[in-house]
């Protein structure tokens, strides 16, 4: 399927406080964020024109920047308003929302404390890609070569651009080998997450998922755990060794893009997508639908 290059699209991007035409949203090639990874971002989705968990994402966006030793010069409320504006201005109902912040081009060295902090928000069309029955076939995951870093070595709780380098490498390798994605281990060889989503397993009716201490405790992950508990499903957060995968019944991943997606294989391990996966696919789909007051607020923009 042909995908229109992102630099050739139309619409508006919010950049440093103002809406600008898509093709005018540019940064200098000597921006510090490009060379030294002083950059963080968010991944969000709008359903029916309303951004799901917008405030939680804005709060994490600012926290991520603080962990990278810079401050986003907008409040949570200003970021929420800017995101809603750019969704409405582009006329999307179901779309992906990408806030990003980076150090600018005033300084080009490891230290760049006087570089301007730039912020942009872009959106693009992103409908739900699969129906429930298609999802229930499950995807296949490779096991990544690279591991999530020790929290003593990197700000693992930040959605920092630099931390995605090994994710890109791992997903490229997985796709070349015929897989949809890759499961990553942590620095001690235990199960961690996928390249852009959290991973959960089911055994004897309970969900088991790794403790989120060296990777993002995803907003979707938190939502899905809450939904599982609300439906009477026990959730156990613990250390999981790779060899334990042989004993799990179901496996699924969750994230902004993935939503809730069952897994049929992780390397040599096989799973059968089942009722808990189905229940959470349906519960999450209901949870993301905007309420009447949210729709009214979006219309008033």
What are these regions, as identified by a protein language model?
Residues 79-107, 124:
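Short, acidic/charged, Gly/Pro-enriched secondary-structure junctions
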Residues 1-85, 110-301:
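Helix-start/capping segments and mature chain N-termini
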């Amino acid at each position: 399927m042909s995908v229109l290059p992102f630099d050739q699209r139309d619409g508006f991007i919010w950049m440093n406080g103002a809406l600008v035409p898509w093709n005018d949203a540019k940064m200098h090639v000597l921006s510090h964020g490009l060379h030294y990874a002083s950059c963080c971002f968010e991944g969000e989705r709008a359903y029916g024109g309303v951004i799901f968990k917008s405030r939680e994402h804005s709060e994490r966006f600012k926290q991520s920047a603080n962990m990278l030793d810079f401050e986003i010069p907008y409040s949570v409320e200003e970021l929420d308003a800017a995101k809603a504006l750019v969704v409405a201005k582009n006329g999307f109902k179901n779309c992906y929302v990408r806030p990003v912040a980076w150090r600018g081009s005033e300084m080009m060295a490891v230290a760049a404390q006087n570089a301007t902090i730039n912020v942009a928000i872009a959106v693009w069309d992103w409908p739900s890609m699969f129906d429930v029955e298609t999802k229930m076939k499950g995807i296949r995951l490779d096991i990544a070569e690279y591991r999530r870093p020790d929290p003593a070595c990197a700000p693992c709780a930040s959605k920092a651009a630099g931390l995605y380098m090994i994710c890109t490498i791992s997903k490229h390798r997985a796709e070349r080998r015929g897989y949809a994605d890759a499961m990553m281990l942590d620095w001690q060889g235990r199960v961690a997450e996928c390249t852009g989503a959290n991973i959960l397993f089911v055994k004897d009716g309970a969900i088991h998922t790794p403790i989120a201490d060296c990777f993002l405790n995803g907003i979707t992950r938190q939502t899905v755990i809450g939904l599982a508990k609300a439906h009477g499903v026990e959730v156990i957060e613990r250390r999981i060794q790779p060899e334990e995968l042989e004993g799990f019944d179901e496996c699924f991943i969750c994230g902004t893009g993935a939503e809730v997606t069952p897994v049929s294989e992780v390397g040599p391990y096989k799973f059968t997508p089942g009722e808990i996966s189905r229940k959470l696919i349906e519960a999450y789909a209901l949870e993301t639908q905007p309420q009447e007051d949210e729709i009214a607020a979006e219309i008033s923009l």
